[in-house]
């Protein structure tokens, strides 16, 4: 949850990294070099205030809802994993992963093709491809097909999981008949 482009960096004085981006600080604009004190030494340019505020809201929401949210994610993700195991030609790559991320492929079909079908014919959004991890895909043997990645959130329902599984079952069946 939150806007892309924002995160946190936690460290202690012994592991304090050296700044790698330099530029105006906004707090000490008269200096030609980055300030030496934290956090200013790590804050080059204009801060992404909307993303920072959104991240703060996401953290607050998670602190209030995290336990129930995690239980819902686990329930829906496990339903998806167990359902995918029953569909011929579906290869799941995240069986032992306890998160809400489920990655799979269908036979030797392109993950992009599967993603497009899910989007265009079923209105289901997933990610496809190599997910910025080409070496992982080489290790897994999926560098040619990529993987379909489902990201389950606490707002997803079992009904949505079954709709998704029904769509994958139809797609896999159609791909087998080609």
Where are these regions (language model features)?
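Pyridoxal 5′-phosphate
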Residues: 1-178
């Amino acid at each position: 949850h939150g806007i892309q482009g924002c995160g946190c960096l936690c460290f202690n004085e012994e592991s304090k990294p050296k700044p790698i981006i330099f530029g105006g600080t906004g707090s000490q604009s008269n200096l030609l070099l980055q300030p030496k004190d934290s956090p200013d030494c790590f804050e080059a340019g204009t801060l992404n205030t909307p993303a920072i505020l959104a991240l703060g809201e996401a953290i607050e929401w998670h602190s209030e809802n995290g336990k129930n949210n995690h239980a819902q994610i686990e329930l829906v993700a496990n339903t998806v994993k167990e359902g995918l195991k029953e569909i011929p030609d579906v290869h799941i790559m995240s069986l032992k992963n306890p998160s809400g991320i489920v990655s799979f492929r269908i036979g030797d079909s392109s993950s992009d093709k599967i993603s497009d079908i899910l989007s265009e014919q079923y209105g289901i959004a997933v990610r496809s491809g190599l997910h910025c991890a080409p070496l992982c895909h080489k290790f897994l043997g999926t560098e040619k097909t990529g993987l379909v990645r489902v990201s389950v959130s606490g707002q997803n329902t079992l009904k949505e999981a079954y709709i998704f599984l029904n769509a994958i079952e139809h797609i896999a069946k159609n791909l087998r008949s080609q």
